[in-house]
């Protein structure tokens, strides 16, 4: 592994892990719908919010404040259910743990300069399930598990061209870590009953494979009038080279440990446009449209092993997983009401079309949540502001009827249900 790249990877994920042990879980595919409590309370409609969401639009960095410190956490509760009959039967709930996703932000305007510089650390999202007692197609009981963590370190700069127009750019340093179990205690010689003939099923345990990649984001913020703001942003794809972990395969004759690499995984490119409109001094409406290119980023993932710890016939195994995700369009709407004494109420709705094709649906990657209702609250005093938000995702059920066991080892009636879930956000800011 490249030393400099591995140091960056472990630094980013290490800082996040101190605050967020366990699994990240998300709602627009693998992404959180919002970047901070205000954004989340407004349903993720955030690209035209000045000074409050530089992670989504670098042109909004800092706003009117000279210095801004912000930080917070999201508490996530992802209830997922897996059912099948043909290769089961199973009716299993993923362990209902509560997970923590943090963010930290610093912005500093350079004296009277039009430049503002900042640094953001953000647990972007990920995915996680843990089924510890699943009946396999062989009749035994085994485990399904995924823990995918995604974090970004984001150096950011914005430039105020004039009173109406601001431009921004950021370097997106993405770090990913993944662990997965696919029936690790199970082995089958396949339909022909001949071990090593090519149709064997081998149980898999992938441990601590990770890596770092780089992307860029550009943003524009424009005040059309005293009431109307527009925002536009574009994020390039982050190619991630993932290695440094272990691949353990159950080959029937023995459990063999390999050095592991994973290729074919990326964080998607995105484009977003949005508006913020002050209906009155006490009432704001926001709306965004966001395009996420999961089709290019999450297609086929290959896990490759090397340097086995035992002398076995399979020296360099390759396991390919077809995911075939689709492009996703996300629509976000929000409203913000200013009450007396600087109390603010927020409401939002977020709809993201399901990017996961049913024929490649897997209980390991339940990324098919579509609709979310949100509620938020904000209060400011002196130089501080406190923001809270609640996200409620609506139930979504999907069934994989793909009869090909090489692409769907869970049977042609496997159903994954993401039950109604909740995310709580808490954030505190200090501006001067």
Which stretches of residues belong to each language-model region?
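Bacterial N-terminal signal peptides that target proteins for export
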Residues: 2-11
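Cleavable N-terminal signal peptides
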Residues: 13-14, 24
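Outer-membrane beta-barrel porins/channels
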Residues: 25-40, 47, 87-90, 99-432
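Transmembrane beta-strand segments of Gram-negative outer membrane beta-barrel proteins
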Residues: 30-43, 62-80
